[in-house]
């Protein structure tokens, strides 16, 4: 029922979570991708979206948001200085720029973590990199501001209409009231 009744964003989150925890061996992925059953085309698309590297579900959503808005990103990008020394690893690198976008959860409000974050931000700035931090609220309700930041970093005109693709994906997922209602209706219909 999960594969048949869920949309790509939800399935992508499940795939990424299972991979991150080592619960989805390669042979099982191959089996899932090769068999035909209700929902298998959707599952195959979800595997295409699940590029790996996410350390949280919100990172997955942030990555899918960028890709839906036609922003090329690379997950878990390692940034080095001019000597090749490690500076930081960013959740999402906006390909072709010196900017990373990251999900900032509640852990970043801890005073000790906040000090580490500020030190890291200084290292990034010293090497000419910029960082944009976003919350779950931003991802769900302020996507156009994330897109605006990306457009600015890419040096392209801001087109807020590009966010519509993200809104369409989000609307069908369990991260929206509409997506939750779709699942409730599907469950009721199957009883």
Question: What kind of region is each of these model predictions?
Answer:
Residues 19-191:
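Surface segments flanking catalytic/ligand-binding clefts of nucleic-acid enzymes
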Residues 1-3:
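Short, small-residue-biased leader/transition segments that mark boundaries at the very start
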Residues 14-15:
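Short alpha-helical scaffolding segments that buttress acidic/His motifs in well-ordered protein cores
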């Amino acid at each position: 029922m999960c594969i048949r009744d869920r949309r790509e964003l939800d399935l992508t989150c499940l795939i990424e979570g299972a991979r991150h925890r080592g619960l989805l061996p390669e042979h099982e992925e191959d089996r899932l991708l090769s068999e035909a059953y209700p929902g298998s085309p959707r599952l195959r698309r979800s595997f295409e979206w699940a590029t790996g590297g996410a350390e949280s579900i919100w990172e997955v959503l942030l990555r899918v948001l960028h890709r839906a808005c036609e922003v090329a990103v690379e997950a878990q990008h390692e940034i080095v200085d001019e000597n090749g020394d490690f500076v930081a690893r960013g959740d999402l690198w906006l390909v072709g720029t010196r900017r990373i976008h990251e999900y900032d959860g509640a852990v970043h409000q801890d005073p000790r973590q906040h000090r580490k974050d500020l030190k890291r931000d200084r290292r990034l700035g010293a090497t000419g990199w910029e960082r944009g931090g976003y919350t779950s609220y931003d991802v769900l309700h302020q996507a156009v501001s994330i897109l605006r930041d990306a457009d600015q970093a890419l040096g392209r005109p801001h087109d807020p209409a590009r966010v519509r693709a993200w809104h369409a994906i989000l609307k069908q997922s369990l991260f929206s009231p509409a997506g939750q209602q779709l699942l409730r209706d599907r469950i009721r219909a199957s009883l």
